[in-house]
């Protein structure tokens, strides 16, 4: 049984359950919204990849906000196939606007969370940096990223079951024409980075620290 969130964000459909965490002893250098994988596959803000990603961002000096999308945990509403979830992402950004108005915002999403987070983050001027973990290029259309002009990190396992690495390399090459994009490939890692979570965390912390330097 996972603990309940320590924060509830009020939204049109009721509330979003969330966990807000400040960096430990490090000075606050920004904020990050961290988004979980597909709810119908059991994805929640307590997912191991999401937890490690948030920890990596905390280590880099960012306040992290993990939310449960609508219909997950104590969040109200029902799953909306990635449409209503876009508004959930915007609600997280609104929270940062109200509570951390002067801080730079990063969106970090895993799998389904990457899909909806990248779509909002590409066009929302409040977001400066993007991180996409386990980008499910075999499942969704990511052509909207061709309009991206922001620094973006893709972290992918070369054994990912939901995102062909060759297809992702092609996408990243196209994104690089307009944005500073990087692809970090973790050898022998599957979609959930089993046995490679420490490496995933290190990649995210290092890239984020460089963006904020």
Language-model segments: which ranges?
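Short, surface-exposed "cap/lid" segments of acyl-processing enzymes
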Residues: 24-66
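Catalytic histidine-centered segment of alpha/beta-hydrolase-like enzymes
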Residues: 77, 189-201
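Gly/Ala-rich beta-loop-alpha elbow adjacent to hydrolase catalytic centers
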Residues: 109-117
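Short beta-strand/loop motif that positions the catalytic acidic residue
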Residues: 148-149, 154-156, 160
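Acidic catalytic loop of the alpha/beta-hydrolase fold
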Residues: 158-163, 191-192
């Amino acid at each position: 049984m996972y603990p309940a969130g320590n924060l509830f964000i009020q939204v049109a459909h009721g509330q979003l359950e969330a966990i807000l965490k400040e960096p430990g002893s490090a000075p606050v250098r920004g904020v990050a919204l961290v988004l979980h994988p597909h709810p119908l596959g059991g994805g929640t803000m307590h997912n191991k990849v999401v937890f490690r990603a948030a920890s990596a961002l905390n280590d880099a000096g960012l306040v992290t906000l993990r939310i449960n999308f609508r219909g997950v945990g104590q969040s109200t509403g029902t799953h909306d196939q990635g449409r209503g979830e876009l508004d959930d992402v915007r609600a997280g950004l609104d929270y940062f606007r109200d509570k951390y108005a002067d801080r730079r915002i990063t969106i970090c999403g895993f799998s389904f969370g990457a899909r909806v987070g990248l779509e909002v983050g590409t066009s929302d001027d409040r977001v400066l940096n993007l991180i996409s973990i386990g980008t499910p290029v075999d499942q969704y259309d990511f052509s909207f990223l061709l309009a991206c002009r922001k620094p973006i990190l893709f972290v992918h396992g070369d054994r990912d079951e939901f995102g062909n690495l060759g297809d992702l390399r092609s996408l990243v090459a196209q994104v690089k024409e307009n944005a500073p994009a990087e692809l970090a490939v973790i050898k022998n890692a599957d979609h959930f980075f089993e046995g490679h979570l420490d490496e995933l965390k290190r990649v995210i912390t290092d890239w984020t620290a460089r963006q904020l330097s």
